Amino acid sequence: MKPVIALVGRPNVGKSTLFNRMTRSRDALVADLPGLTRDRHYGEGRIGDRPFIVIDTGGFEPVAKEGIVAEMAKQTRQAVVEADVVIFLVDGRLGLAPQDRVIADYLRKTGRRVMLAINKAEGMKYTSVAADFYELGMGDPYAISSTHGDGVRELVDEALDLAVQERPELADQEDAGQHGVKIAIVGRPNVGKSTLVNTLIGEERVIAFDMPGTTRDAIYVEFERGGKPYTLIDTAGLRKRGKVFEAIEKFSVVKTLQSIADANVVVLLLDAQQDISEQDAHIAGFIVESGRALVVGVNKWDGLDGHQRDRVKHDLERKLQFLSFANIHFVSARERTGIGALLRSVDDAYAAAMIKLPTPQITRVLQEAVEFQQPKRVGVSRPKLRYAHQGGSNPPIIVVHGNALSGVTDAYRRYLENRFRTAFKLKGTPLRIEFRTNKNPYAESKD
């Protein structure tokens, strides 16, 4: 699971700039979702081989009781609840403000691990810039510049260390083993995630366990189908009530991101009786960016007539065209129709994501693709694609070597992707293609 870091502070201290630097983006991967306030943003970042989730909040005024300021305070409190570590950002140029004291008092009462970061500290002596802020009682502050990046890596590294100290299970990375393929069923509220979970587990003996901690922790449900073990990762807020699991349907961005990262295969569940929303597309985008294997389930199919079904299929092609690599299943979790086929696609998607491809076969497919259609010339030169090999799995990565590869167009990249997908039957997994230009060993030789 990925550690969660929340950025908290009064308005205009540089939280959004720090957020963008941590996610290496001007527009976070996880942007605003419809139904969530614009003042709580989620993004994914990575320091070395350490991935994490970061939450940017609006300017925080804990004592606000009405209007937009109160709503921003509510959103910030929720971010603190979801976080493993809180970075409390203050402004080194303006110095300590009364509002900083109020925020510090609030954060102390939450019991969260808090790191104090003094932003805009570039060109300033640490001792002088830090002196004002010791009275907050937050320990030694970190001096950083979110604009220039000074001190940011050290700050995030320390935050991740604290997160693992707080929850050691964050350091564990588990692949499909004795518990089988891990499946995350994700989607917006009320699309039928909990019904699908109960349909999948049926009347079998179920081992359900709540990982220790708060509501941000996932529930894992183990079951068997056809003699194969599987583990479901809950994102619907399932809680056991006797022998059944009841849903507390509350959409959580953190839970969704955590479960996608933890899963081997993601099932994106849509509601056939509702239009595909921007939120559906955002969730689909999370999955593709994460590189996870994917199966799409369109639920409540039994309630539609022929005309309505045609409209839904057209909507899928138009709004979720970027998911064309995934199998789509039209199911009814309530009536238990189409579930077996969906689960078979889960197995196929996992197999495709973990496939090992021999270099000679990859190179042969590349050569056949180039022979059928060469890349376009760029100026006087044409990209030369010479050989290819596999560069990784989950998702599969194919590395193409050659010369002048910066001239390969996006359209030609998609053409190659389709050729590789067809040749190796890579259905259900993203496929990434990387180009590496060969070095000319004689380029630097002297006559």
Swiss-Prot record:
Q: Where does GTP 1 bind?
A: 9-16, 56-60, 119-122
InterPro entries, alphabetically? AAA+_ATPase (IPR003593), G_ENGA (IPR031166), GTP-bd (IPR006073), GTPase_Der (IPR016484), KH_dom-like (IPR032859), KH_dom-like_a/b (IPR015946), P-loop_NTPase (IPR027417), Small_GTP-bd (IPR005225)
Looking up SUPFAM superfamilies in the UniProt record yields:
P-loop containing nucleoside triphosphate hydrolases
Domain annotation EngA-type G: ranges: 3-167, 181-354
Alphabetized, the UniProt keywords read:
GTP-binding, Nucleotide-binding, Repeat, Ribosome biogenesis
Positions contributing to GTP 2 binding = 187-194, 234-238, 299-302
> Which one GO biological process term can you cite for this protein?
ribosome biogenesis
Name the Pfam families for this protein.
KH_dom-like, MMR_HSR1
Mark the transmembrane ranges: none
An example molecular function term from Gene Ontology annotations:
GTP binding
- Show where the KH-like domain sits: 355-439
What this protein is reported to do is described as: GTPase that plays an essential role in the late steps of ribosome biogenesis.
Recorded family membership: Belongs to the TRAFAC class TrmE-Era-EngA-EngB-Septin-like GTPase superfamily. EngA (Der) GTPase family.
Per UniProt, subunit arrangement is: Associates with the 50S ribosomal subunit.
Q: What is this protein called?
A: GTPase Der
> Per the UniProt entry, what species is this protein from, by scientific name?
Cupriavidus metallidurans (strain ATCC 43123 / DSM 2839 / NBRC 102507 / CH34)
**Which gene produces this protein?**
der
